[in-house]
Amino acid sequence: MFKTSVFGYIIIIFIIVVCLKIYQESDAFQLKCIVSKVDGNKYCVRERAKLELAADLLATVTQKMKKVVKHMGDTFPDRDNVKRLVKNFRPEKVSETLPTSEFTAYSENKGEKLAFCVNTTKKGNKLIDENTLTFVALHELSHIMTESVGHKDEFWNNFRFLIDEAQKIKVYTPEDYKLRPKEYCGMTINDNPHYDN
């Protein structure tokens, strides 16, 4: 009987440890979710002195992404890549990347979730400017509308297409990052397909 109860306690402790580990690695532990004044939606952001500014930046860029996706769907409704974008974009699933994330931004499963670093450096708290984050968001939207995985020609064509359309509707102002590179979450953006021949 003693062996059975000891074994039971060991199993219970193991389950508790596993649950705590899962919780600590989850968004709920490392991000704080707050409602943005920009659009009234909830955004999960890293703990920092001014949570509202980070949530509002994500909300502003999300509004821009919604405008681009709507424009694409209205203007090019018969294109397969646009159909994918319209179908898979989930504006309610936008958040900040976890502090432990190896990626500066990512699209999970082609649109189920979008996450962005909103800082100029990996460890700092200085927020990135809205136009640069919009460029990164267009990059992630391009992954959603691209059937292939990675950065193949299909992706770059879609990215250039989105940038051009975002410029037309005044959502994004193209910047030549080769001439004026930008720091984004510890990396340097030094190319913009809008300026490629």
Each model region followed by its residue ranges:
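Alpha-helical scaffolds flanking conserved acidic
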Residues: 129-135
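Metalloprotease/metallohydrolase-associated module, dominated by Zn2+-dependent proteases
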Residues: 13-24, 31-35, 39, 48-128, ...
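An acidic/histidine-cluster motif and surrounding catalytic segment
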Residues: 44-46
